[in-house]
Amino acid sequence: MESPEVTFTLAYVVFSVCFVFTPNEFHSAGITVQNLLSGWLGSEDVAFVHYHIRRSTATLLTHSLLPMGYFIGMCFAAPEKELYNVYKAADGWKVFVLITVLLPVTTSILAFYWSQKRWGNHPLAKTLAHHALPQSSWRAVASSINTEFRRIDKFATGAPSARVIVTDTWVMKVTTYRVDVAQQQDIHLTVTDSRQHELSPDSNTPVQFITIRVASVNPRVKPFDIRLNSTEYGELREKLHAPIRNAANVVIHQTLSDMFLETFKSLVEANQVYELSSNQELEPCIGCMQTNANIKLVKYCQEANEGECQQCYCRPMWCLTCMGKWFASRQDQQHPETWLSSHVPCPTCRAKFCIVDVCIVR
């Protein structure tokens, strides 16, 4: 049986990681800095900038107390170590105690410095000052952002720890400890990366995330990256004034069918290959007439007389892309989690098949 100190350590590590990175379960339970300190932070809708100035400061202070919380907990989980008496503790614990004291002291001094000049020393205030007119201040920029954030036509997406917000004038990225801000009229946007995941934890369907670099012509504004679901790409472009360059030649799937098609292709490419006899020639795909047909349906999923699938005797008449589009078009659009395991009729002879039966012709 594990000792209480090991159990407490594992539990506290899990709690700390979840408290810092705040998964959906912690948000639902209200175990976040924003919820615990909501009375002091105020309302994001009323004063967006001042809310995040306080939130980032409070988050830094709260997170700096986590090591101290662990030490206090260990005093109760392992009383035989007598950790409450620092002079009797081992050297390693003495160093840890020093760290637990220095962290909140340092962050408190930093928070006090940020709060001077009515929060004028805060990193967000300094960032906004780069966008202020010569005869103006960061507070004028903050007022503009606050006003535009209250409008219902803004674009907002992402997890609470990495939100992307686009208003008529501003592009903002809100993270745990900072807020990046760029003015729309000054920016260049470039798609730099794309990551596709076979399953989304929320919908149990394939999902593609794209990364866009936001670079300002203002040399004092640091570039930053925003990350969003490809299905939101079209809505983002409508809100942006500047075009988005695709420097990495990334294929962006803006619909669920686009993402399914990529998954369909990758699965078919892993299936068995159909060897075409030497006296047969491939004809153009009857679906698009732009490429040769390269798909043959052969029942490989089960024995000949078993299961729902049937043997198709059609010659190769469809290309992989058109067959994938046909497969997607026959699915229940309300239940995408069933697409990969479903059966559909052959577009020519109506014999039922599944993805395992789709073979590339060689």
UniProtKB/Swiss-Prot annotation:
One annotated GO molecular function is: ubiquitin protein ligase activity
Q: Which residues lie on this side of the membrane: Lumenal?
A: 1-6, 78-94
> Assembly state and interactors?
Integral component of ER-resident dislocation complexes.
Q: Where is the signal peptide?
A: none
Quote the protein name from its UniProt record.
E3 ubiquitin-protein ligase TM129
Organism, as annotated = Xenopus tropicalis (Western clawed frog)
Q: Which residues cross the membrane?
A: 7-27, 57-77, 95-115
One biological process term from GO is: response to unfolded protein
